[in-house]
A protein has these predicted regions:
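Peripheral interaction segments used for macromolecular assembly
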Residues: 1-130
Length: 130
């Protein structure tokens, strides 16, 4: 008997690949060794394609003083269901030198040269060329 034959039958529960954006915000980002890098502050979504272009990580600071935001191309993050966190392979030096902006400022998302710099830094394909 299929679900169409029995309207009260429940579908099998399987893990799914979709998640609401507000559930991604606040998710921890770790290195492969488990060390915390930061947390996802927000996602930047391409309005035309609907694809996630960047995860903006909040990093450092205490009580938001000195906190930086790091826009990271989405393709550089990998989700690890075992720990419920995203992972990025990045060293302390790479993190310190990564393009960032102060938490009380805003990145100029309209400046394609800044986005190109981000993609070059992370050796990631530009989302607009996918």
């Amino acid at each position: 008997m299929t679900m169409t034959d029995n309207p009260i039958a429940k579908p099998e529960t399987k893990p799914h690949a979709l998640i609401a954006s507000d559930r991604v915000e606040g998710t921890v980002v770790r290195r492969p060794n488990g060390e915390k890098v930061g947390a996802i502050e927000r996602l930047m979504i391409d309005k035309l394609s609907g694809k996630v272009a960047y995860a903006v990580l909040s990093f450092g600071g205490f009580l938001r003083l000195g906190e930086k935001h790091l826009p990271i191309p989405w393709e550089r993050l990998k989700y690890d269901p075992a720990v419920g966190a995203y992972s990025i392979d990045i060293t302390d030096d790479e993190l310190a030198q990564a393009p960032s902006f102060a938490a009380d400022k805003e990145f100029d998302w309209g400046d394609r040269s800044q986005e190109t710099h981000l993609h070059d830094y992370y050796k990631a394909r530009p989302y607009w060329g996918m």
